[in-house]
A protein has these predicted regions:
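Flexible glycine/acidic-rich beta-alpha junction loops that bind and position SAM and/or redox cofactors
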Residues: 14-18, 37-48, 79-86, 102-128, ...
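Short, hinge-like loop/turn segments at secondary-structure boundaries
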Residues: 23-25, 92, 121-124
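Active-site lining segments that contact anionic ligands and/or coordinate catalytic metals
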Residues: 30-32, 72-74, 101-102, 152-154, ...
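Hydrophobic, well-ordered secondary-structure elements that form the walls
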Residues: 35, 76, 96, 104, ...
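Aromatic/hydrophobic pocket-lining residues that form the small-molecule binding cavity
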Residues: 57, 89-92, 128
Length: 185
């Protein structure tokens, strides 16, 4: 019997009310959603041609939390996108703190030939690296706080395989956290 359903990612513009309803109705659908936002600044999102605003993004999350309070989120962030100001970055940090993403995959913008942003003036590398480090430290703190809440709790794990170590098994919880358990069974 199929125990869990998980899908990798969805674009915010494709996250319809119908999909939100599926999250409510399908108990096997895991309560972790990877919903790439890229930035907390509407200015940067527009420059990236992302087709969603922060307000629309937050509205999706509000609807999801309303129908499934245990839902958690992960996201992708591009730090140092051309034209990103200190204020734009602070808006991204503010979003991170507000949503408390349990996983935040963050990277410094890198120019790619053939893309509209390729010829735009890049953010100074030193500033971009400082911002990324700041952002990742905040992300780590949020993730640590989240994981502390799991300590001493009994949670369902779907085991995937045995590890190389004798009597240890690898699995994941419903929020896709890795778990290793020692057992003689």
């Amino acid at each position: 019997e199929l125990k869990r359903i998980r899908y990798t990612t969805s674009h915010p513009r494709d996250f319809t009310n119908d999909l939100i309803q599926v999250h409510k109705d399908c108990e096997k659908l895991m309560p972790l959603i990877h919903l790439p936002v890229q930035s907390g600044s509407n200015n940067i999102l527009e420059n990236m041609n992302r087709k969603h605003t922060i307000e629309e993004y937050l509205n999706i999350i509000e609807k999801l939390k309303k129908i499934k309070p245990n839902i958690e989120l992960s996201s992708d962030f591009i730090i140092g996108y051309p034209g990103e100001t200190r204020h734009d970055f602070e808006l991204t940090v503010e979003l991170m703190k507000k949503i408390k993403f349990i996983n935040a995959y963050s990277f410094i913008y890198s120019a790619r030939p053939g893309t509209p942003a390729f010829n735009l003036k890049a953010v100074d590398v030193i500033h971009a690296k400082e911002r990324l480090l700041t952002f990742q430290n905040i992300s780590k703190k949020i993730k640590t706080e989240y994981r502390k809440k799991l300590l001493a709790k009994t949670i369902p794990i779907l085991f995937e395989n045995k590890t190389k170590d004798e009597n240890k098994y690898f699995g994941r919880d419903e929020h896709f956290n890795s778990v290793i358990v020692e057992s003689k069974e």
